[in-house]
Design a protein with these regions (language model features):
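Hydrophobic transmembrane alpha-helices of multi-pass small-molecule transporters
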Residues: 1-98, 217-219, 227-319
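Membrane-embedded alpha-helical segments and adjacent helix-loop junctions characteristic
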Residues: 8-9, 36, 53, 66-177
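Alpha-helical membrane-protein architecture signal
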Residues: 49, 132, 136, 140, ...
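Transmembrane alpha-helix interface/packing and boundary motifs in multi-pass membrane proteins
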Residues: 55-63, 140-150, 191-203
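Re-entrant/interfacial helical elements at transmembrane boundaries that shape
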Residues: 69-73, 151-166, 187, 200-217, ...
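Membrane-core helix-loop-helix motifs of multi-pass transport proteins
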Residues: 171-253, 257
Length: 319
């Protein structure tokens, strides 16, 4: 977002952050004086105005994004929309700590290139046939997106997928239509599978955790890590198979012969990674332990003498 704001400033000559800063303040001050629309309470109108004010500041980056997020913590108590305790609890609830812990673990996986090794080992084992290569990239992308952000997964996998696509474009055996179909299927499959993987675990994407918090707060029913996976994983696997089949057999059928150069690209990436470092091994062990606690806490708790595990505590422990 920041780069887009800078780009708009350069082409327009306007100071976008200053305009957003003043625009958000002026808009909110004027809107506060208006009567709420029919069917909306006064408090509801105030919350809506504050939300729009924050949206203006976020889009223009009038102040740092994190600072804008703290606006309700200041204004809600002043406008009697909630106490500092009730508002502040939303900034430090279980959902927030689960997101934080999962994010830190994901950063560690990226920091030591564990995600690259997992992806390359997965793709290497599917062979060199085009349809299998697409499936391998989709499987690796979906698995990684279960634990790190969809964007990080796609950014990491994209250059490798492009290398494979360009290799088959230039040296693969097949007509131009099949070569184009392979590249299209590979790129779309990579993107779709990252989104699908993100829905398979609670920490796959932040919206999952936000839904968990909202559901528990409003309906009093707790969703733990295993509960989510019992629904998300079967749906995710089904969607992966459907998307792979639609891309490779229906929308962009690819009639090509595999190219041994694909294996060489993957081997080169693995060679670049070298042997697993101590830090990478430790990260893998922490990841496996944390995921095991999330999934198997129901089996472990009876042996803990009354101690209770929760997903947020496990996430912080792993972090």
């Amino acid at each position: 977002v920041g780069s887009k704001v800078v780009f708009l400033q350069k082409i327009s000559g306007l100071n976008i952050p200053q305009i957003g800063l003043l625009g958000g303040l002026v808009f909110s001050l004027l809107a506060f004086q208006l009567e709420p629309p029919e069917g909306l309470s006064g408090d509801g109108w105030l919350v809506l105005v504050i939300a729009l004010w924050m949206a203006i500041w976020w889009m223009t980056e009038a102040v740092p994004i994190a600072v804008t997020a703290l606006v309700p913590l200041v204004l809600f108590p002043i406008l009697n929309l909630g106490t500092i305790t009730s508002v502040g609890s939303s900034y430090a609830g279980k959902a927030v700590f689960l997101t934080l812990g999962g994010f830190i673990i994901g950063l560690a996986i990226q920091r030591w290139n564990l995600h690259s090794r997992i992806a390359m080992e997965t793709v290497k084992r599917v062979g060199i046939e085009p349809k299998g290569v697409i499936g391998g990239f989709m499987l690796a992308s979906a698995f990684l997106s279960m634990w790190i952000t969809n964007t990080a997964t796609t950014v990491m996998m994209l250059p490798i997928a492009l290398s494979v696509a360009l290799l088959l474009q230039s040296e693969g055996e097949g007509d131009a239509v099949s070569k184009a179909a392979f590249g299209t299927s590979l790129m779309l499959g990579l993107s779709y599978s990252a989104s699908i993987g993100g829905m398979m675990t609670l920490i796959g994407t932040s919206t999952n955790v936000m839904f968990k918090g909202y559901f528990e707060q409003n309906y009093g029913l707790e969703i733990d890590f295993l509960d989510w996976m019992m629904v998300g994983v079967p749906i995710g696997i089904t969607l992966l198979v459907i998307v792979w089949w639609m891309l490779t057999f229906v929308l962009f059928p690819c009639e090509m012969i595999g190219h041994k150069g694909i294996g060489k690209i993957i081997d080169k990436k693995l060679d670049d990674l070298g042997e697993m470092s101590n830090a990478e091994i430790r990260t893998l062990l922490v990841f496996v332990l944390t995921a095991s606690l999330w999934i198997g806490k129901g089996l472990i708790e009876p042996f803990l003498g009354g101690l209770v595990l929760n997903d947020a505590s496990i996430a912080i422990f792993g972090a």
